[in-house]
């Protein structure tokens, strides 16, 4: 109920603050949002690999990276991990991972991350390997070093408040300049599956801040698109690069939202008679699945309504598979067979139509997005050089 109320408030705020001005391409704010979903992150990883390949082709630049084109990249849970991988700099100040490196990452590390701990009372997985590999990959990099604005969510169980890690908020909240590996583990620490994460940050004046964090989906549901849009709104208002934008209109937003798949209509459904026999643990697992699916649907519905109301429906693309079945519905099945199935899901999704009313496939829509992103980047660079 509280989540729905928050959505409605943000929805009407968006409608109230938009205007009818036409957006210039170079003034558009570009946003990438990536859902949570555990090992199902393989699905958006396939989409990201295709999009980055298209950007490299359009710009004739094999070194082009997603972070070069998006003003804001946001993610929750496994989406937060993907966000960090494509925005964390290497020694050459370029993203340490190309999009094509993400699927191999899941295949190499997924079976070790989702290795049952054997605990009956504690979480299903101890999280030690996950934290170790995040430390190895992300090193000592902190939020302020990200190559573009990020929006990664978590929830503090001690203060009972959401925690949103962004670059643009560091001036007001320097304690949020945490290490990326701490942030990534925290946003992925789904209750039941992984232990909560405790860490401490220190500001330049010596102040000490303590965090006790769990999965970002607790704070922002599995689809962080609304969060990413709100961060983009603030960025457009505060960043000098967008000084020409006097009043933000959602016609000036270009949003790509990537899902990790939901169950088909006839899979994972239950009857009242069946559910009446469930115990607390079975209910907790089912409620998490139901809540994530419902919240993802409602987020897409709200955002679609806003963009349509502003006659900007082509500025929003939601890429989601709505017919997962069998093992592909599980967020923690990291068997090689299931990961291969998830790769197939992502590749097949590219060939599917965006909607029943449009013959355009996701592949074609992403090519269109790539062209827009490329053109905007060139216009922005040309404007900056004069």
Swiss-Prot record:
Misc: Patatin have a dual role as a somatic storage protein and as an enzyme involved in host resistance. This tuber protein represents approximately 40% of the total protein in mature tubers.
Function text: Lipolytic acyl hydrolase (LAH), an activity which is thought to be involved in the response of tubers to pathogens. Can use p-nitrophenyl esters as substrates with highest activity on p-nitrophenyl caprate (C10). Also active on mono-acylglycolphosphocholines and diacylphospholipids, with highest specific activities observed were obtained with the synthetic phospholipids diC8PCho and diC9PCho. Mono-olein and myverol can also be hydrolyzed.
Primary location class: other
Keyword Signal: yes
Domain remark from Swiss-Prot or TrEMBL: The nitrogen atoms of the two glycine residues in the GGXR motif define the oxyanion hole, and stabilize the oxyanion that forms during the nucleophilic attack by the catalytic serine during substrate cleavage.
Any one Gene Ontology molecular-function term assigned to this protein's record: phospholipase activity
Organism (species): Solanum tuberosum (Potato)
Signal peptide: 1-23
Regulation: Inhibited by methyl-p-nitrophenyl-octylphosphonate.
Gene name linked to the record: PATB2
Subcellular location: Vacuole
Domain spans labelled PNPLA: 32-229
GXSXG (motif): residue ranges: 75-79
GO CC terms: vacuole
Source species, domain of life: Eukaryota
Gene Ontology BP term (one): defense response
This enzyme's EC code(s): 3.1.1.-
Active site: 77, 215
Protein name according to UniProt: Patatin-B2
Carbohydrate-modified residues: 115, 325
Matches recorded under InterPro entries: Acyl_Trfase/lysoPLipase (IPR016035), PNPLA_dom (IPR002641)
Keywords linked to the UniProt accession: Glycoprotein, Hydrolase, Lipid degradation, Lipid metabolism, Plant defense, Signal, Storage protein, Vacuole
Outcome recorded upon mutating residue 257 to C/T: Loss of hydrolase activity
Any matching Pfam family: Patatin
Extent of motif GXGXXG: 36-41
UniProt record similarity statement: Belongs to the patatin family.
SUPFAM superfamilies registered for this protein in UniProt: FabD/lysophospholipase-like
Motif segment (DGA/G): 215-217
């Amino acid at each position: 109920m509280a989540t729905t109320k928050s959505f409605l408030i943000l929805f009407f705020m968006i409608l109230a603050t938009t205007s009818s001005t036409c957006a210039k391409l170079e003034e558009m704010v570009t946003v990438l949002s990536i859902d949570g979903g555990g090992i199902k992150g393989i699905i958006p990883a396939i989409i990201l690999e295709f999009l980055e390949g298209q950007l490299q082709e359009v710009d004739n630049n094999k070194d082009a990276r997603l972070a070069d084109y998006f003003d804001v990249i946001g993610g929750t849970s496994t989406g937060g991990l993907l966000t960090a991988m494509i925005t964390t700099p290497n020694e050459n100040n370029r993203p340490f991972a190309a999009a094509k490196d993400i699927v191999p990452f899941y295949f190499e590390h997924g079976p070790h991350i989702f290795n049952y701990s054997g605990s009956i009372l504690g979480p299903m997985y101890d999280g030690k390997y996950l934290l170790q590999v995040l430390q190895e990959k992300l090193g000592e990099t902190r939020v302020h070093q990200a190559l573009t604005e990020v929006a990664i969510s978590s929830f503090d169980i001690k203060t009972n408040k959401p925690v949103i890690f962004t670059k643009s908020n560091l001036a007001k909240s320097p304690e949020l300049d945490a290490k990326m590996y701490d942030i990534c583990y925290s946003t992925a620490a789904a209750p039941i599956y992984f232990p909560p994460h405790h860490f401490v940050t220190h500001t330049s004046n010596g102040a000490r801040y303590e965090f006790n964090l769990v999965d970002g989906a607790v704070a922002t549901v599995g689809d962080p698109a609304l969060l990413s849009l709100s961060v983009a709104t603030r960025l457009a208002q505060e960043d000098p690069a967008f000084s020409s934008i006097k009043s933000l209109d959602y016609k000036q937003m270009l949003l790509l939202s990537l899902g990790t798949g939901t169950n088909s209509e006839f899979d994972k459904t239950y009857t009242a008679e069946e559910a009446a026999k469930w115990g607390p643990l079975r209910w907790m697992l089912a409620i998490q699945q139901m809540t994530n699916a419902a919240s993802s649907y409602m987020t897409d519905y709200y955002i679609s309504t806003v963009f349509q109301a502003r006659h900007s429906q082509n500025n929003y693309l939601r890429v989601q598979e709505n017919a997962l079945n069998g093992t592909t519905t599980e967020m923690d099945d990291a068997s090689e067979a299931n990961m291969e199935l998830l790769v197939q899901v992502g590749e097949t999704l590219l060939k599917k139509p965006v909607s029943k009313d449009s013959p355009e496939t996701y592949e074609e829509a992403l090519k269109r997005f790539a062209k827009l992103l490329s053109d905007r980047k060139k216009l922005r660079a040309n404007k900056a050089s004069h």
